[in-house]
Amino acid sequence: MFRSLAKLRCFASSLGLSSHKNIKSVPLIRNIHYIPDNPSYFTQNARFNEIYLHLENILKFAPKIIAAEEDVPKKWKTLEQYQKEFSDPKTTKVGYRKITRLLNELNEIVPEYRTEAVQKALEKFIRPDIVVKTTLKSQMLDENGMSITKGKRKSSKATVKMLPGTGKFYVNGSPFDVYFQRMVHRKHAVYPLAACNRLTNYNVWATVHGGGPTGQSGAVHAAISKSLILQEPSLKQVIKDTHCVLNDKRKVERKKTGQPKARKKYTWVKR
């Protein structure tokens, strides 16, 4: 055993490998190690970072043509569906909210100008059940040319039926100038018709409940704006330019602790 070991000749540490004669006969051994394909491999959640960076890159080179708000429904998969389909169980609600924020920006692009990459990215995250519902809920005019739309403002909700006519306007069965006693509420309710110069072109029947006159007139205002777009799609830009409200999400600001109201403060008294 010791004789066989004595016959082995080791390389001197002071000499390079090229100085030995039999170097070509010695097999070159390299350290074999795995090189990951994904640059995010060494991060805490590689799958999430890969998807997020991919969407961010698509958004960077996507055309910046924004559609109207009513054409941008939110219809993304739930967190549980995302974790199962994308094999990403580590992502939390906060992380998935970052992904949906990018998807909302991509979804705001006008469909006619979306690139193939944008369309494919959106299709991967769209909930199939929501797609069916939006198809069934597509608003159309009936056989008489009447549109039925709904509007909200504060705690008030309104349903408006509108069809071509002579300018009649009823709210809960009463003429609108009788139902809304203050001029400011009357003007706000009919503002979309006045802005589009259609005061005498349509008959309007509105049903409204909840809230006070300010909220009810705002709900009727929003519903009429939607009805005008259904009746005449060419008025969409006019309604947008004249600042007609389609969806007003403002709410009453909550009262703060230590204050009499939301913003009002108690008088400071020196003690």
Swiss-Prot record:
PROSITE patterns: RIBOSOMAL_S9 (PS00360). Component of the mitochondrial small ribosomal subunit (mt-SSU). Mature yeast 74S mitochondrial ribosomes consist of a small (37S) and a large (54S) subunit. The 37S small subunit contains a 15S ribosomal RNA (15S mt-rRNA) and at least 32 different proteins. The 54S large subunit contains a 21S rRNA (21S mt-rRNA) and at least 45 different proteins. One of its GO terms (biological process) is mitochondrial translation. One of its GO terms (molecular function) is RNA binding. Signal peptide: none annotated. Residues 251-271 are annotated as: Disordered. It comes from Schizosaccharomyces pombe (strain 972 / ATCC 24843). Transmembrane segments: none annotated. Residues 1-11 form a transit peptide. Gene3D superfamilies: 3.30.230.10. Residues 252-271 have a biased composition (Basic residues). Component of the mitochondrial ribosome (mitoribosome), a dedicated translation machinery responsible for the synthesis of mitochondrial genome-encoded proteins, including at least some of the essential transmembrane subunits of the mitochondrial respiratory chain. The mitoribosomes are attached to the mitochondrial inner membrane and translation products are cotranslationally integrated into the membrane. It is found in: Mitochondrion. One of its GO terms (cellular component) is mitochondrial small ribosomal subunit. Belongs to the universal ribosomal protein uS9 family. Pfam families: Ribosomal_S9. It comes from the Eukaryota. Keywords: Mitochondrion, Ribonucleoprotein, Ribosomal protein, Transit peptide. This is Small ribosomal subunit protein uS9m.
